Amino acid sequence: HAQSVAGCYGDRNVKTPALDDLAKRGVRFDNAYCASPICVPSRMSMLTAQHPSKQRCWTNDDHLASDAPTWLHALGAAGLYPELIGRMHAMGPDQMHGYAHREVGDHSPNWGGVPRHDMGVLNGTNDPQGHSLVACGAGQSAYELKDCDVTAATIEALDRIARECRPFCLTVGLMLPHAP
């Protein structure tokens, strides 16, 4: 969620009571920044707290070494149960990197040589001309449908966690907004 439109960050125009309450009771990342403009290096930097040059992921085709320590490993060692729902875009055979459970995976395979599913009119969304957006027109995209699955799984997980009444770490990876 954009910091500029959240009550917990001082916006007085929008009403975000659920986010405000979560921020009051949880951890808020006030000084976070993106370590790379590219998806995989940025996400792996977030997991390791290391710049791309240190964790050795420079492109979307690079993968984080399975033995690279992440803050999720530390949470697991402290007795928490880190969960991931949805997109993380971890390339390579290790899709967990310290997460103990993953309910919904990425939108497509993240390992070279594995065929990706057909995205229909979304194929080529990253093209600078945005041809797929023109072809797609109004309506639901495959990314929106994926996000619906992720959102439903997240609601179920939060309900379960509330019943268990325990500290938790839940990472939710949505597709949208995304390219272009």
What residue spans do the PLM features occupy?
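Formylglycine-dependent sulfatase
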Residues: 1-180
